[in-house]
Amino acid sequence: MKVVIIGGVAGGATAAARLRRLDERAEIIILERTGYVSYANCGLPYYVGGVITDREELTLQTPEGFRNRFGIDVRVGQEAVELRPEQHTVTVRRLEDGSTYALHYDKLLLSPGARPVRPNLPGEDDPRVFTLRTVEDTLRIRAYLDEHPVRRAVVVGGGFIGLEMAENLVHAGVHTTLLQRGAQVLPPLDADMAAEIHAYLRGQGVELRLGARVSGFSPQGDGLAVELEGGERFPADLVLLGIGVAPDTELARRAGLALGVKGAISVDGQMRTSAPDVYAVGDAVEVRHFVTGAKSHIALAGPANKQGRIAADHICGRRSAYTGALGTSVLKLFDLTAASTGLNEKQARAAGVAYDKVVTYSASHASYYPGARNMTVKTLFDPASGRILGAQIVGFDGVDKRMDVLAAAIRAGLTAEQLTELDLAYAPPYGSAKDPVNMAGYVIENVRAGLVEQHHWDAVAELPADGSVILLDVRTPGEVRKQGLLRSDALHIPLDELRGRLGELDKGKKIYVNCYSGLRSYLACRILSQHGFQCSNLSGGWRFWSYNATDRTHDAAPTHLCGVPTGKD
């Protein structure tokens, strides 16, 4: 059996290695148009910023290494330019001299990946305007930084690459402006979770502009000007375009393969395309979203590796199927970590999925042990069954392991009640007896059981100001002096004084309660409801509201963590 693989990196290289483990006699050829067959493309920004200092560390496997260990024929600098499925042949161009040759296959696997989106703007071809996708791109950017006095950089786009490059340019001592066309960075998060990232970025010295529509690039002195619609200009010595990626499917399109979402290659559960004996994996294919079942384009290394393994299994006659992706992702941004899995609100609404949500605020480990840091956890769930649909976390230590637990929970179809029962590793330096994952389950359980009604940050401004409802703040006097009230018409009664001051409240008016994070206001709601008051708890508390409704700065201090008692001041 002769298997030709077009493209290496995650999906193609994984498939090749799996094929060899399953079939020692197969002839396996990898065609890779770059000079690197298997490299850590997720690590490229960190070489630019100097975090990774040895570029050889980015190379996971060399052509020689593949040949020696796996007996695989790796042909770098060679590009597949034409695919003829009916003839089982592919035309290959040697990039060094432009010569071509035909290559026959029994099975073909496409792993062309994705290409950076270029918006085709005036001045975009200036050599100081870069994209980042390959090792060669990385070396060009690093060389430019080394050889030129780069003082100011503009990053266009606030996705994963844009944010990671902004961080690493700051690490390299470059004043960095990030221009994002939309109203938020990091689209896998909902806007209310991204708000904390906006505050944090600005606190790290990144000049962040949202709603910034770039119209072109033009020379300005010794550098460039990045021009916005409306005429505003940002000076730059270097520009990085990080506005997303698109499936690199031109070869597949010309060959007549069926394409789907965003032009990605349509495949079945065994990663087979519409052409006989042709498979496809990685960032170029559409997949089934595990929660909704809908076709999606999810360009991540984890799914690409799994798909490569499954395609290899099927080529070798093994029963294996890809059942879908959750889109689980994590981002390091200076000291901050942001992660998500499953559905966010935008996706749930688009798919017509019924959902409810809770926002909880927990410590990374036992708050009495030094170094505890906060994390904000937003969890979406099915209001009828309690099944977990999606989660987002923004915080510091321990975000990744909680997200992994929640991703596994969604995959297993767990409900909120089952989250409360998870027996997770605990010792004071590592976690809490009530882990942040357990806490999310407890809060959902309370909401579904009718123990508390909740409202969200965007409802605060819409609450009547005519005295027909009561806004009750149960924080300490010191907190209120420092942070202020949600609204000037709010009533302040500290939680520990509430039982003795119930007479100040009107049972004929609904009470909307808040504290700093949502825990003490929940306790207040339990007191009030059992004394005949109708009340609602502000999910996420003052802290979550303030990131979304004000221009507050980021506060990473472990203030009023869940479960920590507070005094009067």
Across the structure, where does each feature detected by a protein language model lie?
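FAD-site-proximal beta/loop scaffold in flavoenzymes
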Residues: 125-149, 221, 225-227, 232-313, ...
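Glycine-rich dinucleotide-binding loop and its adjacent helix/turn
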Residues: 110-172, 207, 267-269, 491-495, ...
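Rhodanese-like catalytic fold shared by cysteine-dependent sulfurtransferases
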Residues: 417-469, 477-510, 516-569
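Beta1-alpha1 glycine-rich phosphate/pyrophosphate-binding loop at the start
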Residues: 1-74, 79, 117, 166-189, ...
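Mid-to-C-terminal Rossmann-like scaffold of FAD/NAD(P)H-dependent oxidoreductases
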Residues: 1, 8, 284-397, 428-432, ...
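Rossmann-like dinucleotide-binding cores of NAD(P)H-dependent redox enzymes
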Residues: 59, 152, 160-218, 299-304, ...
